[in-house]
Amino acid sequence: LLATHPYEEPAFDFYPLLNAWQQAGAGVIGELPSPETELDFLKRIKKTFEVGCLKHNKLAGREIQTVALCGGSGAFLLKDAIKNKADVFITGEMKYHDYFGHETDLLIAEIGHYESEQFTKDIFQSILKGVMPHNQIFISKVNTNPIKYL
């Protein structure tokens, strides 16, 4: 800092980041009200997230009830989903080799990075309306997904 501003005393402050809730993270895990077959669950995810296609690992005939989800590039949470005994892990994108060795652990559903995050603007609008009820909150209609499908 002094090398950049040798002629003056630079002003700076350091503040510790004291998060009140230490359990916050990038993903969520929850339970369905009742179990579903793998195929029925994948079809529902495909419809809910409005995706033309989704990638998944081999179906193993398990029932799906515990669901782990991380939007965007969530592959780094795959081991946590397994550790927490999730039946399925839904994320936006994973690497090819991330699929290997997990056929008996859980179902992996990869729905696309943009597709997994496309509804967050609606969630944020709802939160902002609750905090600022007298302000207008607009949602952009621009599709920023650089990936196109044939």
Regions found by a protein language model. Give the residues of each.
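Hydrophobic structural segments
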Residues: L2-L150
